[in-house]
Amino acid sequence: MNRILSRAQMRAFDRHAIDACGVPGVVLMENAGRGATDVLEREVLGGDARGRRVVVVAGLGNNGGDGFVLARHLLLRGADVRVLVVGDPARFVGDARVNVDAFSALGRSFETVVLREPLERALADADAIVDALFGTGLDRPIAGLFASVVEAINAASAPKLALDIPSGLDADTGQPLGVAVRADVTVTFAHRKLGLCTPRGAELAGRIVVADIGVPGSLLGEETAAFTFDAADAARAIRPRPSGAHKSSAGDVLIFAGSPGKVGASLLVARGAMRAGAGLATIATFRDAAERLDARVLETMTATIDDADAAESLEDRVDALLARRNAVVIGPGFGTDAKARAVLARVLERYPGPIVVDADAITLAAREPELLAPARGRLVLTPHPGEA
């Protein structure tokens, strides 16, 4: 799993690297800019920067400093680099000023943007555009000349690389602060930022590449905003089976799912459980859905919740189904009527193991949050935006 950081966590990470580990800020900036150069050359320029026209649009903060590091490394790789600074260059300070001076020491100058039209002409000739205007620290809407610059970048036809985060994107919410750069590639430093993982943020960021800046992730301790979880993580989470393993030794999953018109939901869950390594999976559903289910399953078993002996109550039937299970899923396509509610309440009250609460079960819990209070097992809720 890879960590996802909020704006405050990334700021603390940088500060800890500087104060506790003795890594100067100028070194972090150098590593970030050099890593971004590698990404630009590989992902945008086809593996060779020589002779390519690159326009770097830089702000006055550390993101602009990263842009100057990138511009210097591009020059050393034979690119035709043009740096356009938005704002008064006299306001560069600290590590950013060091890298502005290092770029100038190569005998190259930069230009200052004061009007949109000259900027548009410069961008029209570019093979690639680097957005180094604002980084993760931006927390107010972009306006005035800066908004015009972002609009000009977006209107240009050349592919765009954003440094750390597209300028104008809120690093926490993933929403544009007024206007935001629409990048083709975003190279984000050290760790993904929370805003890049929202639907709108991911759309504006384009392809996201994480660049190492030479600081171990262990500096974060356990605190992080979120984690990524991909196919490789899932594969690592499945324990290797011993040579003598059989279906009863690999986990037994009970799935309360499916109703008329939504039988497919139960089949998808069962397929996922088996693919994740379960040895046994049983779909428990009501009689009217079970009749549509039996002919469609192969390795999954089925059980009918309301088709037991007439003397057996619904609660007793649920208890019998729960016996000796290793995990329970409840909710996909299950319905939200009184019977479904009664099953959910019983499962939460009686089952001590892990319970995935999904779909219709989340809807029921949202209507009556007190349903979750007596839960004995560890709950995993998986809402989509309409259920969250």
Residue locations for each model-derived region?
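Small-residue (G/A/S/T)-rich helix-start motifs and N-terminal tracts that mark the onset
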Residues: 1-86, 93, 185, 196-355, ...
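Short, flexible loop segments at the rims of nucleotide/cofactor-binding pockets, characterized by
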Residues: 106-112, 137-142, 305-310, 332-336
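Short, conserved catalytic or adaptor-binding loops enriched in Gly and charged residues
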Residues: 100-107, 179-180, 200-203, 372-373
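Nucleotide and nucleotide-moiety/phosphate-recognizing core
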Residues: 38-133, 141-163, 343, 351
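Positions that flank functional sites
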Residues: 89, 118, 168, 288-289
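Short acidic loop-to-helix transition motifs that present clustered carboxylates
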Residues: 115-118, 165-171, 194, 310, ...
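Internal gly/pro-rich beta-alpha loop/helix module
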Residues: 126-128, 133-225
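A short, aliphatic-rich alpha-helical micro-motif
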Residues: 123-127, 153, 180, 322-323, ...
